[in-house]
Amino acid sequence: MKTDKSVFICEICGLKDQPKMPQVIGLDFGTTNSAIAVADAGKEATLAYFSNGSDTTSSFRSILYFPPKDRSSTVKAETKAGPEAINSYLDADSKGRLILSIKSYLGSRLFTSTQINGRYYTLEDLIAIILRRLRTTVIEQFGVSATTVVLGRPVRFAGADTKADETLALNRLRSAADLAGFSEVTFELEPVAAAYQYETQLDHDELVLIGDFGGGTSDFTLAQLGPGRKRTGRNPVVGTSGVAIAGDTFDSRIMMNLVAPKLGLGSHYVSLGKELPVPVWLYSQLSSWHRTFLLKDPKTMAVLREVKNQASEPGKVTALIQIISENLGYALYRAVESTKVELTENEDADFVFAHSSVNIEDTLERWRFESWIQEDIQNIATCVKTLISQHNVNYGDIGSVFLTGGSSFVPYVRRFFAKTFGSHKLKGGEELTTVAKGLALRALENA
């Protein structure tokens, strides 16, 4: 980014001042939540805020809502993003198209475009709507030009199995940013950005392990941080790693183990004289929130109706059909998410889903939930331990462990880090906005 070459005269002292550092932008486009921040020299990064009814929030839900097409009107219904998308969707009694976790598609070649209200949207088009809303807000609130941005990216994109997939994901994200009005884009790893923000809290130099737990991925960075690093401006990164396991994964475990059996998973139906299990893939789609709209495909609905007619427990399959046909997937998602959040503070939580004629209630104990995510935690642990061993770091040399992101609150996650590094080393704060602030601070070093 070019600095402002203008030199102004200080009105008080009458002396020439240094060229003014322009405000720079950091944008964290997340699977579940996004945020955007600005920073200038000598100041902390400042977050943009968004209206949410009578409240404001610095965390912008990465959600799109397309209202149903009104054939009697020539006026195109406005596409909603963030908090407005959720509120509009609920006000419309769940009619229309709600799109969640769209970041999860970046590394997948299976998604190229989708048709909504008679128009085809590419993945880049959809992501650009969210990024454009974030950009517009920061322009309105801070008066910046907002053509240059440091944009966060995970260490490993969800669904990206090869280097070619990673390249595809980055190219798509860059194209979406360009469509949103960002003509100059620099990428930074999200856990590295979190390190820049955590560094503002340090009054000494130390080796830090950063854990960024998003909706789609969990990413880790080893970094040398502190005042000494800031003075020299040297690259703080020792090493990075990541795994495609995070908040959405934990949600899916609740869906598959608690909810899906009440919608027919594990039951049977008769086809051509043979007793067969109800297809598991139906529930796998339902547990991946960003794929639920695929279940409304006419062929899938025909399969469901056939299964229901020959099912051993037709009432359960009927409930699944209602959830799909009445667009109740988001309400089900919120019920699952609410249960997971409640388990961060309590030993058990009541799962309640009561919409239309579908009524599901159960109590979930924390120990059961932890048994479902045990393998996920082990994979996260392996990722962290491999990162440390690859760089020949002694565990005792790590001064602190900074955990950010919504899933950093999950007790099982915290117990692993406390047991491995010591509870006194665990740090946190601003779990949903740390990365955006860090990206803005990183942008200062580019300015």
Predicted regions and their residues:
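N-terminal phosphate-binding loop and flanking beta/alpha elements of the actin-like ATPase fold
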Residues: 7-56, 86-210, 224-244, 360-391, ...
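Core structural elements
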Residues: 217-218, 296-306, 404-409
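Phosphate-binding glycine-rich/basic clefts of nucleotide- and phosphate-handling proteins
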Residues: 225-355
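Short, well-ordered loop/turn and helix-capping segments at boundaries between secondary-structure elements
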Residues: 255-260, 264-265, 419, 423, ...
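Short beta-strand scaffold segments in enzyme catalytic cores
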Residues: 34-38, 62-65, 219-222
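P-loop NTPase motor core
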Residues: 63-77, 249, 253, 257-262
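Short glycine/serine/threonine-rich phosphate/pyrophosphate-binding segments
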Residues: 216-221, 436
